[in-house]
């Protein structure tokens, strides 16, 4: 029995005493304790060593006092499990070797047994659950098919997604074949994480804004919907969050996937998003991550604006406070603590019946 289930209740749009808070990338370089662990292992080794992954997952719960933990991993463990070599290059980001550029390349990618190839994530979840001891929920996650497709085809990050766009425009059938393969592994991976104990899952579509609205509805949205439906059909009580970064014009379409909550980027007004969606789903977000460089007083002021814009809760509303993207690595941890304390102290007034 969870001692603090506010996060799950907010996602289910059930009554809460206050607004829960967690932040994306909360297990990360802004924490000196994380940097100490990281000094012992490179990033990929950290992901693949369950004891270390569990340790850094729990750190922000112990140190900052957030309302949910998110398992320490990376969205690119999926293409690696499918047969692509993965390296995280310091200060340059991820690199996937032998990028997918042809039909033969697509064929050589395997749909693995995730319990085998990604068993180290399952082991990290089991260890983390023991260390959390039911203090807060644990979130599992995966990248969305479109975002993983871009990494697989480009071989890393990209400014214009030239090769990914070339594939969807010139060879749409091949693109859909690759997206379908990736989507199957995403679904299997989310289900594995649920089976070993996570309490909710989030799908990250980091490169959602790279596509036009029409292309997003063709090459991205159907695959998100596929994963959401698969999870909800097997585990109807497990909340699913979809975070499609900067996809501000298609919130209704994203809600139509059947997810329980939508993560919002910081460049959309949360009041407008709530009005547009009419409390059909819970909302998560959406403070600009750079606000955490400001003084604690200013952080509280900006966070207060978001609470006020979301407004008074009703019997069918849900809000999880978060950043509009991941916390930046050089933020002062005390500034995040100031934000968390403010939300805990001040959000209750918006939950009074």
UniProtKB/Swiss-Prot annotation:
Its EC number is 4.1.1.37. It is an enzyme of class 4 (lyase). It catalyses: uroporphyrinogen III + 4 H(+) = coproporphyrinogen III + 4 CO2. Keywords: Cytoplasm, Decarboxylase, Lyase, Porphyrin biosynthesis. The keyword Lyase applies. The record marks 74 as: Transition state stabilizer. Pathway: Porphyrin-containing compound metabolism; protoporphyrin-IX biosynthesis; coproporphyrinogen-III from 5-aminolevulinate: step 4/4. It holds the Pfam family URO-D. Gene3D superfamilies: 3.20.20.210. One of its GO terms (cellular component) is cytosol. Substrate binds at residues 25-29, 74, 151, 206, 325. The keyword Cytoplasm applies. One of its GO terms (molecular function) is uroporphyrinogen decarboxylase activity. One of its GO terms (biological process) is protoporphyrinogen IX biosynthetic process. It is found in: Cytoplasm. Belongs to the uroporphyrinogen decarboxylase family. HAMAP family: URO_D. Homodimer. PANTHER family: METHYLTETRAHYDROFOLATE:HOMOCYSTEINE METHYLTRANSFERASE RELATED, UROPORPHYRINOGEN DECARBOXYLASE. NCBIfam families: hemE. Catalyzes the decarboxylation of four acetate groups of uroporphyrinogen-III to yield coproporphyrinogen-III. This is Uroporphyrinogen decarboxylase. It comes from Chloroherpeton thalassium (strain ATCC 35110 / GB-78).
